[in-house]
Structures are given as C-alpha cells and as structure tokens.
Amino acid sequence: MRLAPLPIPTRVYRGENVDSYSRRHAARNHCAPSDVDRALREHGILITKARLHPVRLQAWRALGRLRATAFTTPERILDEEVTERALCRHCTRGERARGRLPELGMVCLRHRRWLGSPQVDLHGYHPALVAERQFRHHLAARNVLHDSLPMLIGRDCANPAIIGHNEIAHRRDRTSINDPWALTYPEQVKIARLLTRPTFLGIVTDPDVDETQRHTLATREVEKIIPARDDAHPWRATNRVWTATTHLTARRRDARIHGTPIRDTYYNILRLI
C-alpha cells in the first residue's frame, strides 16, 4: 500500500528524530502521532508499536514526503550512544525539535548559539565560536562526541572554580553571558583535544616512561590551557587529567599481558594513539 503524504507539509530538520518530527507533523495536520500510528496499524502497515521500527520510520518519511536520509543518524558511534538533544531554536525557527547531531559540539555556528539549556546568544564571545570550529575539525572528525569521555573530563577541568572566579567574572561582564559552561567552553575543548592528541597520549600513558616524567608533562600541558593566575587552581585540572591518564596507562599495561584492553569509554581514547 502506497502512503499519501499528509496534506500540510512539515520540514524536517537536520538530525531530527522521528518522535520529534512525527509530533510536529501531526500537530500541523491537526492530529496526534498516536492517531496516525493507530491508523497505520489498522490498515496493516504497522505490525508493531516499536517507535524505531524501520517500517514506522519509512511510513513517516512517506507521510512527510521526506528523503530516504531522514531519521538515519546513527544511534551509536564506536559503541558510544549519540545523545538526543534539543536542536538550535533558530535553526528550527522557534519550534521545539530534538535529534542527534554527532558532528556538532555545543555551538550552532550558523546562528552563534549555545546549545545548552537554556540556549543563549554567543555573538559577543568569539572564543566559544573558535572552540566549536576546533571541536568539529579535531574531535568530531575523529568520532569524539560532544558528551564523550574526553569532553566530560574537559568540562570537569573547565570548572569555574578551577579557572578562577575573577576570570569568569571578567568574561561575564564583557559578554553579558551568564552560563558558566558557555564561558568555559574554550577550555573544555582544549582539554579534550589534549586528551586525544596522539603525541601526548603516547607518552603520558606509556607504562615504560617514568611516572615523574609523565606527570610533569601532564602538568605542563594543562597549565598551558589553564594558567596559574589570580584565584585559578590549575592543579585540580591536572589531577583530573592525571587520574584519567593513570586509568589509560593501566589499560595499556594490562593489554600487554592479556591482549586487547577492556573495551570501555577509556578504550575509545586509546584508539586515538
């Protein structure tokens, strides 16, 4: 049975998932997604209530007259979940939409918007835009997601209490941005890049390299990103990075004994060496 599209068309946004689109498309046509799904089951088109069943995805593509690429963003990349999140409200013209965008960090460069909650304007904060370009070029290009372990460690290190409240206050006064995570995004991305840099990883996680030498390297590289100034506490960031690299070193050591290391979130960092 060939499905005819619903009368009123609805644009699908890049990365948008089927739940988000079906809600908007059904509402625009004065019904609910559940009503449409029920009708599809009554006509024998759907045989399951599974939201992500291929037949349901294809049905909603037909109902919206969408391309075959709609709803095909992978759910997982290298065993890591691609998290669904709110899309840029400027990209969606104010509509609420959700989806997966593995190639994006936390900034919509087109509209210069912070994609956290709430979304805020970043026109006055150029370092965050630079950080997003670096994320896409150096991290996303190697399948490092916006909420992957390197970025989570980066966020821990970019804590306002570590960077220093004086520096954060200066950025807030200069940009009128109140979200601390938007203000510290540049440091977050830099730490994540450090933790995925092959030359750094190769040395700091090498069991054969003296521990003092490895710790000195970690300290020096972290303090390039978060300098010891005013009320900053870069040693706390160093401790976080050192803890992570210690786990990685242990996995490399175990791999020499047992073969392939444990496949976990730390393993996904080791693959970058």
Feature-to-residue mapping (PLM):
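Basic, alpha-helical nucleic-acid-binding regions used in initiation and control of genome expression
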Residues: M1-I273
